[in-house]
Amino acid sequence: MNNDTKINTFAIHTLGCKVNLFESNSIKNDLIMNGLVEVPFDSKADVYIINTCTVTNKADAKSRLYIKRAHVQNKDAIIIVAGCMSQVNKDLMDKLKISIQIGNKYKNSVFDLINEYLKKRERIYRVENILAEKKFEQTTQDFIFLENTRAFIKIQDGCNFMCSYCIIPFSRGRQRSQKMESILEKIKTLVSKXFKEIVLTGVNTAGYLDENNNTFFDLLNNINKLDGDFRVRISSLEPFQINDEIIDLVTSNKKRFCQHWHICLQSGSDDVLKKMNRKYTTDEFYKLMQKILNKSPLTNFTTDYIVGFPTETDEDQKKSIDFLNKIKLYDMHIFPYSKRNNTRSSHYKDINDSTKKDRVKEITKLNYLNKKENLKKYIGKTCEVLFEKKKEDEKMWSGYSNEYCRVMVESGDNLENKMLKVRIKKIFFDSLVGEIID
């Protein structure tokens, strides 16, 4: 590229969590508003943006792969690397021939950074000390959409808990939250645009606390008071942050709040939980689930789960299997343990990969069986389903129930973005099939 080069196209690839997805959409929106055209990542573009993840070694490897892929697509392109891997790895710029490296700050400034690069023709490194960040950074786009039915709102960022295996406090910084009034206004806007499901997302969602000391309960309570035909789904929660106030509010307002709780477990062994620096026991986790189920019996629970934590023994695995059989979660995001630099567990003796693989297979098989078992409780029951899409050349519409079950019905009508009651008739693989109740 020479000094007169004009950029017209960009491509972006996102790795990792919903928060990253949210921020990528904000970057995308800003570039489009400034006249750039998005093209697929596997085609030639003037600018490539890779919004990275570093939660596991696999995430790092994928991030590097997409950076290299961008170079192959266009050796003269501007390569921008952002996100968590970029935040904690200072040596990426030289190793991977990056034009612009930012972390989790300055994602709102990508267009300005591109112009700065074009003007100076010098590589730009803007990675700040994320642990010093105290204010929630507003994005250029307030929310993102999925399937034209669901919208995500990022309510907070960062985490104050130093779990021994986790790199997130170093890549995302300390906890900081968006003002409650701002969130409420965004929800009103989304509802006026006919969105039926709002997903509250963040790094540590239940740790929400804005500068006016509004808590997560305060936020939910005020959302519950809003007018409109919509429901709210809450993303990842820590078990020790779920109090009776939150449980009572969510379970007693089933039309407003989805009866689906994603509560982070991470291990079914108390010894492992202690070494992970998790702030609960398996018994406390079980009692929390029972408290919720007593008030809302059809509730589904999902979780994140780490297999093969350093020092995890065969006995720990057995205890975990027994506990998972006891609580029968609806679904789990299962990760083999991955050593992260600067975390406490990186100094522990790791277990071998073959043992990890065997244990992952065992937990994955159990997860499949428990999901099937959970689905049985819905047969003959009525669920409220938000329909999203229809398979091409078929009459089967699919959507998600309040409890986060995939539900399919046959209909010749257009059901997109309609919230309808469905009587469940049978299980089909990992989904439910039913009929619409008039």
UniProtKB/Swiss-Prot annotation:
Q: Which cysteines are joined by disulfide bonds?
A: none
At which positions is [4Fe-4S] cluster 2 bound?
159, 163, 166
Comment on bound cofactor: Binds 2 [4Fe-4S] clusters. One cluster is coordinated with 3 cysteines and an exchangeable S-adenosyl-L-methionine.
What is catalysed by this protein?
A: N(6)-L-threonylcarbamoyladenosine(37) in tRNA + (sulfur carrier)-SH + AH2 + 2 S-adenosyl-L-methionine = 2-methylsulfanyl-N(6)-L-threonylcarbamoyladenosine(37) in tRNA + (sulfur carrier)-H + 5'-deoxyadenosine + L-methionine + A + S-adenosyl-L-homocysteine + 2 H(+)
- Indicate where this protein resides in the cell: Cytoplasm
| Enzyme Commission number(s) of this protein | 2.8.4.5
Name of the protein described by the UniProt record:
Threonylcarbamoyladenosine tRNA methylthiotransferase MtaB
Q: What broad taxonomic lineage does this protein's source fall under?
A: Bacteria, Bacillati, Mycoplasmatota, Mycoplasmoidales, Mycoplasmoidaceae
